[in-house]
Curated annotation (Swiss-Prot):
Cell compartments where the protein resides: Cell membrane
Residue ranges of coiled coil: none
UniProt-recorded name of the protein: Lipoprotein signal peptidase
Reactions the enzyme catalyzes: Release of signal peptides from bacterial membrane prolipoproteins. Hydrolyzes -Xaa-Yaa-Zaa-|-(S,diacylglyceryl)Cys-, in which Xaa is hydrophobic (preferably Leu), and Yaa (Ala or Ser) and Zaa (Gly or Ala) have small, neutral side chains
Record's function text: This protein specifically catalyzes the removal of signal peptides from prolipoproteins.
One cellular component (GO) term of this entry: plasma membrane
NCBIfam families named among the record's database cross-references: lspA (TIGR00077)
InterPro entries according to UniProt: Peptidase_A8 (IPR001872)
Active site, UniProt feature: 110, 129
Sample GO molecular function, one term: aspartic-type endopeptidase activity
Organism encoding this protein: Clostridium novyi (strain NT)
Amino acid sequence: MEVLIIIFGIILDRITKLWALKELSSGHEIEIIKNFFSFNYLENRGAAFGIFQGKTVLLVLVTLLIMIGVIYYFIKYRPTSRFMRIGVSFIVSGALGNLYDRIFYKYVVDFILIHYKNVYYYPTFNIADILVVVGTIMLAIFLLREGK
């Protein structure tokens, strides 16, 4: 099941990013909810919240090391919690989605923008980012419930 989640997450991320490249990269913005939610193309050459700008090689290496660590953990410990395995699968699919962008584009395609008028703008993000955040929350809940 975890492999299917990872594959589905990567496919969903790729489809939405290809759509953003085609429809939004020319500077076109699609407003979904006026003054609150829109699709707006951004080439993110860093990590979350714009940190590590221009450090593509570092980000690729860190992502690869983390993926190797996760695979090692799953092979060695074979976790039994379905909730935890699903959460980690979300994290892996999101990480691999953004890794693909970094390797092939040298930046990550972001396009989801939440803002309040012109007063506040949350950093632009993508489906892979959502998967990583949801998976991390699930993993944290699992760890808190298990007391480990």
